[in-house]
Amino acid sequence: MRPQATLTVMPVERPLVGRVSPPGSKSITNRALLLAGLAKGTSRLTGALKSDDTRVMSEALRLMGVQVDEPDDSTFVVTSSGHWQAPQQALFLGNAGTATRFLTAALANFEGDFVVDGDEYMRKRPIGPLVDALQRMGVEISAPSGCPPVAIKGKGGLQAGRIEIDGNLSSQYVSALLMAGACGKGSLEVALTGSEIGARGYVDLTLAAMQAFGAEVQAIGDAAWKVSATGYHATDFHIEPDASAATYLWAAQALTEGNIDLGVASDAFTQPDALASQIIDSFPNMPAVIDGSQMQDAIPTLAVLAAFNRQPVRFVGIANLRVKECDRISALCDGLCAIAPGLAVEEGDDLIVHANPALAGTTVNALIDTHSDHRIAMCFALAGLKIKGIHIQDPDCVAKTYPGYWDALASLGVSVQR
């Protein structure tokens, strides 16, 4: 574990103006790394994110015989035979949900014994529904606790057929099955059950990346896809900036009435979290009810921004936030109440933020327990732009997805004190 250092964000008294380039998308980078590792040949991934989550994915690929070179700070060059070797050790993936779920399904396509494991936080994050789905497909796989570690005995390829999985649970399970399906023994149909598809936009990201690497995917209605067993071919692939990271900068601009140039328009993003830009643009008149089901990683940003809104905001469709890097609903509620008692309340799996614009310009003594969750650390820094006395615990946890976050704020004139 990282030592529990503390960082204090000092309020700003002027609009934030400048240019900041967000890092590459974590979601797309880890999809591209996986697909490049499954492809035959050499792929060049540009605009990529270099962070804790992408590091563990690239290191796992290296352990299985894939060559992953890093010629600069935003490029991966991946050379693979398309066949992975079982390593002598467990694949340790930290707290990277994308790497853990994507690799768990992909490993069923190869011969050998594999163990997928993570840190103490990842060992609390569910993977049972994906394991159950793979078991129904005939894969010899187990995760006794319903969370990592996961043991997989690969037999050289997923069986052809049809698999159903509840689309409400996690889009990462769906994406994992889709990406693995192209390397199986025959066509695989992945069908979603449940009343809604959670974070459908991330499934669309997966399908676009698969097709860029040569997969043949046919939509069957609105909630099923047939993936042909074509495998993948190497390609050059450019990764757009991270929309979740952009939300902090959009919110900082809104809070300070500034002008921060990200080098890319909000409507140019393909990631679902970019939907948050429209809500941020409505500040301080954000809607009374916000459905977060399709932009879950943006909810921490919006929740802190809502504290300064002109009316209370209820966040719905966010139950999956309870099984992210931490229970983000509780972490957000606790952090907001550390700033002002009663500022937020949990109601079932909804979060209600009782807006109080008068908080701006006040002084508190709020120690924010981030639970080593990068998004909790980054979103509460926004509160520090308007309120004196916001202290962020374990600030270096931002390295999971945005290692340069504190430097980015400093470049805009924000004083951060350790």
From Swiss-Prot:
Q: Which residues form the active site?
A: D297
Which InterPro entries does UniProt cross-reference here? Enolpyruvate_Tfrase_dom (IPR001986), Enolpyruvate_Tfrase_sf (IPR036968), EPSP_synthase (IPR006264), EPSP_synthase_CS (IPR023193), RNA3'P_cycl/enolpyr_Trfase_a/b (IPR013792)
Q: For this protein, what reaction is catalysed? A: 3-phosphoshikimate + phosphoenolpyruvate = 5-O-(1-carboxyvinyl)-3-phosphoshikimate + phosphate
A GO BP entry is: chorismate biosynthetic process
Q: What is its EC number?
A: 2.5.1.19
- Which positions are annotated as binding phosphoenolpyruvate? K26, G97, R125, Q172, R328, R375, K400
Q: Where in the cell is it found?
A: Cytoplasm
Name of the protein described by the UniProt record? 3-phosphoshikimate 1-carboxyvinyltransferase
**Organism in which the protein naturally occurs:** Pseudomonas syringae pv. tomato (strain ATCC BAA-871 / DC3000)
